[in-house]
Amino acid sequence: MLTLLEPPGAKRSPTVGNYNNRSAQHLLNLAPEEDDLYETYEETEDYAENEPTGNILTRSFQFLDQYLVGQSSSADYNDRWKREFRARPSWCDADLCLQQMNRGKATGNRYALYSRSLIQKLLFALGNTVHRNAWSIILAVSMIFAVCCYGLQYVHIETDIVKLWVAQGGRLDEELNFLPNIKEAMRNVTGDSGPELPRENGLGGGYQVLIQTPEYEGQDALAAGPLLKHVEIMKHIASFNVSVHGVDWSLSDICFKPAPPSVAADSAASSLGDVIDKIVPCIWITPIDCFWEGSKALGPHPSLPKSSLGPLGMLLSSLSDGDMIRWSDFDPIAVIDEIHRSFNLGSHYTFFERAGVSHGYMDRPCIDPLDPECPPMAKNYFDVCPHIDRVREIAKKYGTELEEEKKKDSGYSFFDFLGRKKREAGDQPKMIHPAQPADSIPTIEDAVPAQVPVSTAPIPTTTTLSPEEARAAEEKEKKQKARELKDYCKSYRKSAFEWLKKNKDKWPEVMSENMYPQNVDYAAEMTGGCSGFASNVLNWPEDMILGNPRRAKKGGKLSGADALQSVFLVASPADVFLRFKQKPGRNSMKTGLDMDAWNETAAEQVLQAWQRNFTKSLYNHKANVDEDGNERRTLHPLASTSIADMLEEFCQFNYTIILAGYALMLAYAIVTQARFDNCLPATESSMGLALAGVLVVTFASVAGLGLATWFGIEFNAATTQIVPFLTLGIGVDNMFMLLHNYRDVVKLAGGHAEMAILMRETGMSILCTSINNILSFLTGTLLPIPALRSFCAQSSILLTFNFIAILTIYPAIISIDLRRKKAQRRDLVCCLYGDTREESYSMISKPKIQSKRIIGAPSEASIMQQFDGITQAQMASSDDPAPWSLHSFIRYYYIPFISKPASKVAIIVGCCALLGASFIGMRQSTLGLELGDVLPEHTAPAQFLRARDKYFSFYPMFAVIKGPNIDYAHQQRQIDNYRQSIGSSKYVIKNKNEEPSEKYWLGLMRDWLISIQRGFDEEVAKGSFNLTSGTVIGSNVSEDARLAHALMCSHGSLFGCAGRVGKIRLVDASGIINSDGFYNYLTAWFNVDHMMYYVSQASFFPTPPKWELSKNHTENFIPAAEPLAYSQIPFYLTGLTDTAVIVDAIKDIRSVCERFTDQGLPNFPQGIAFTFWEQYLFLTGNLMQAISIITISVFCVISVLLFNPWAALMVVCILGIMTCELAGFMGLVGIKLNPVSAVTLITAVGIGVEFTVHVVVSFLTALGTRSQRTSSAVDRVFVPVIHGSFSTLLGILMLGFSEFEFVVKYFFIVMTALICIGIINGLILLPVLLSWFGPRREISPTGGKTTLTLPPPLPKNANSSRSGGDDSDEDDEPSGLVMYSRQAPPTTRTSGGNRGTVGNNTRRLPAV
């Protein structure tokens, strides 16, 4: 059949050239034979009814034929479309293929064609519907999308990193929520019994951390400079204040403090409750606790004057001479001893002994021995008094006059007199410098300088003094002289120390070398860690406070370290609220605080404000800037609010980056679709469609996010930083596929149902790619990481919306643009017409030529002369590839190249080498995800985490015992064994006895009971108890003994002393606590020794009831505590340097926990390591499961849509190769395997379909040999696939500008690599494999032909019910032009809807 574009004799005319996109395919040996373009139909060949048979298969075919065959007629299309059909029949119309198979003209995969026919008919109907109702479709779908967008107002961005990371519904989630769930179940209402230890929630919780890193490479942190710098930073933190609710708050207000010993209400010390609360220091874990300077930051803050102690402050001679109570000169044990001598402290005194509260910091060495306040008890104390005169002399010699410090006039009081008298009466310790021989110390007389005014008043001699009186007078004179010397030394002490610091080179003129101030060996002092003010219970392992500690030999003392770390424990909001809540009989703890507005919410606001300002203050500290003003970050703070605040800030949509990314995509889409005519957009240009396509995809993405919000899917960093760009890049792929086929279909359809044909021919590829993309992200939700589940779920929803939009709104817009083209209006500037509109004929817009006009041979030339120019102009842009275009390169260079056998072998060898390299990369791949990578660069939390990963391998953990169905009383030995088994792990820090370094509640309770038993035994020896009746008969029984009596009498709900007092032991010889009264003892220990309870970090729930010891021993029943539903044992882990080691430690400790759970002691571990690395135990299994599921899904989807398992298998094989190569690439470039990279591997399977399925579908639908079909497939789809690849690349390009390192590393880099790998495998390797092993074509003409002829037109009555005959505009009706054929068949041919007898020697030309 001829077309009006090619009259007889003009086919090979050089002026006509290649007139469609198959015209040059003779270069690829794909052009059909010229005689095959025409077919003469005989009436006898028209469809004969198949005789029904009993064959079930035949009957099924007949049933399917009834609905899927015979709905399309070859008369509906022009010759150009028929040319396309003959080369790739099933691509164009599976119905016509089945008609030819029924006629016996072809054989093939009937099942695939039935499936294809069904899908094509649905798509055809969709295209027709959209074309007829374009504006209605746009309005309706847009309204639905707009309703979905309404959900965006409910967006919630999740910033809790634990909720983002911990798998929901899994073992870890159950363990983290065990305590809240058990509290909810038991509904226990707790009173004001005291603060709970701040619970760590993964990255801090109640822990605020500071890391100090070296100022330059190689700096030793265990030197005076870094240590003193840390002291100053700690002082800065301790004195840092924020104003909230009109009140200033410092760290001491919100820090965690162990509860002070309880004081009975009738005690003389009860009025000192507020003072004791202020004196008890904050618990912080710091390396400077090894030294006296550690006390400087303890305060108290604000300063606590002695006057707050009332008369006691004046009477206590053990207090320092200053007006303020400070830990830097406070000797706790001296004060306690003095108070104990006056007021019997009872069990509280033994508590201080057990806790190791001795001299506080007074006996610890000084970092700087030239500090004027360095106490005499320090081992490197330097006494400057003997050298004061010499210092003054030498200083004056060099032009410096030491400044005398004026003595403060503090007045005089009676209490001061008493206090001083007591001090004078006491013996003062005589301090000897370590390097100074005792006999070399000058006597006081010798040390007093001549200019010191010494009292020389003669002793009255009116009476003769006895020898004793003379000696007393002499002694008094010496003391007077010593006091005067002390005052003199004190007045110049500070200035003398300052001069010595600045003039170390002058020391030889002042003193001999052996008397120089001596620095201690800092590394030796810090070996084994440091201790807080209670040295027996507050121990800080060196791995916790020192970064990368070094030793000269294993087991020896430290030789150095790289960093210092301090940890501040911050109380819970409930504790802060109770701390400042007005208490009966007590003064307000915070002046100016509005008690009416004071509640837990207000306390939480105080905590958050302080923590935020703490981080900001240290991050901008002057220590982070060098002398030249350049950033030199050495202080790295982290507060529990830091990560949440940072995530909330950076998880917001960055509209600048988003707009830039979308503008770049718009520019690319417009440039690729632009066609110009006289510097104006041509009619065949599609810039408007490209612009509309990007906007449609954007609108669909926004609507998808809105629906995701309706579904309750929370936003996170992946949502805001990745999803907009990734879905844009993937979503526009289908847009480019539609636009690429749009031009061809418009020319091929000949004005008949263009949109329906476009959807029918392109829809299959869109279905395959879109469904697989959606499924791949849905499969990603199998990974149990909430943040990644949200990301995958949102991506799948957005891709679904993109899919809907690309099948509804976008075709409707194309339909509107089609009318523009038919009207010959220019693109974008629709008010202008194309230059050729008036004088030319278009395939789309045809002049109204008389339908019955007969064109004879003599007028052929004149007719073609009229249309030849427009034909050349319209076809130049798409039919014949433009010179130097990508399509031209593909057709004329690339396809011939890959068709050569040598090239195929080279490609296979190269791809095998690439695959081999990927296997090497996979072997090098390691597990892990640096927590710093998931946070934005140049933020305080990210810098902190990187410093922590570099310098520290220390993590705290807890072993949690799950009640309440545990019999603690009878399972004590098992609990001890459980703790010992965990402690035996090589990762647990141990003490010198090879036991876990941290004491735990059962051991501390046991020690307390033993001390109580010891006090009881002493009273029994004195006869203070009647062991028969169990009564107290002594008059002055110690508090410990009375407490032991109450413990022995209380057992369960009973109180009976007879037969128990003196007969039972609170703790037996094997260390087992008496089981009868175990829960009674637990109550007593919790209330009496509760400071040890808090130190033990036991976190009991439910907490034991309140109880206090009464003076009436008959009223001392101790109520039993409820069985514990929750308790925990602390451990410290070290050596956790990387993910592999951490995972091994988790496995080791988990195995112990599981073993004891099987033995009847339910338990689980908890801590940072378990929270963030637990998923690595199951990552490989989850990854393999997800990849298997998506691979099977892809196989099933392609098999169902194409009904060709062999084609699906080839696609899956290529996808498998791509996944392996991507995994190998990540291993080679050092991208670790973790849940984030696992998502990219899973989605790579679905995204990889974009590079393969288009080629396979085109290959299946083409005719010819495998090589010819491969060449045809590459020629047809290479350009749109490349456009899709570049659009995806442009979409993810903006990810490279994200502040999040994990976005850049795990999405931008990996996705870019995926695109490159996809192009290599989909457009280079796959064509080679298809040319060798490709699946059989879906249909094969009989008789060995390489083209398939069309079936005869359907009878009018058979064709009347088909859609499409009147679906297009009026301009689409066939023109009815008739011309002579070059052959004169005896039959009549009809075209379009106008079928009639034309004559024996004529035939009607189809619409063009």
From Swiss-Prot:
Keywords linked to the UniProt accession: Cell cycle, Cell division, Glycoprotein, Membrane, Mitosis, Transmembrane, Transmembrane helix
KW Magnesium (keyword) present: no
Compositional bias ranges of the Basic and acidic residues kind: 468-479
Transmembrane segments: 137-157, 650-670, 687-707, 710-730, 766-786, 796-816, 902-922, 1176-1196, 1218-1238, 1239-1259, 1277-1297, 1306-1326
Glycosylation sites: 599, 1026, 1036
Leftover remarks: Membrane proteins Patch and Smoothened form a receptor complex that binds Hedgehog morphogens. Despite the lack of Hh and Smo homologs, ptc-1 is still found to be functional. Absence of ptc-1 leads to the formation of multinucleate germ cells and sterility.
Role this protein plays: Required but not essential for cytokinesis of mitotically proliferating germ cells.
Annotated family: Belongs to the patched family.
Protein name in the entry: Protein patched homolog 1
